[in-house]
Amino acid sequence: METKFFVVDRIDGDYAWLKRTDKEAEPVYIARALLPEGADEGTKLKQEFLDYEVV
């Protein structure tokens, strides 16, 4: 599976908008429960195998 890099662009209640930083793509709308604890707007993330970690 492809490794992807994101930044948390916006928090919207129980969901977050993620913006790809490694290539041009549409924003991703994802449940905050899937993100690492403490992830907030501006947090940089790496996604591998549907698992997110702060970078």
Each language-model region and where it sits:
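Residue-level signal for tight coil/turn positions that link beta-strands
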Residues: 12-13, 49
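Short, Lys/Arg- and Gly-enriched loop/turn segments at beta-strand edges
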Residues: 49-55
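Beta-strand/loop nucleic-acid-binding surfaces
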Residues: 25-37
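Structural detector for short beta-strands of small beta-barrel domains
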Residues: 1-12
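Short aromatic-glycine-enriched beta-strand elements
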Residues: 14-18
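Short nucleic-acid-contacting surface segments enriched for D/E, G, S/T with interspersed K/R
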Residues: 34-47
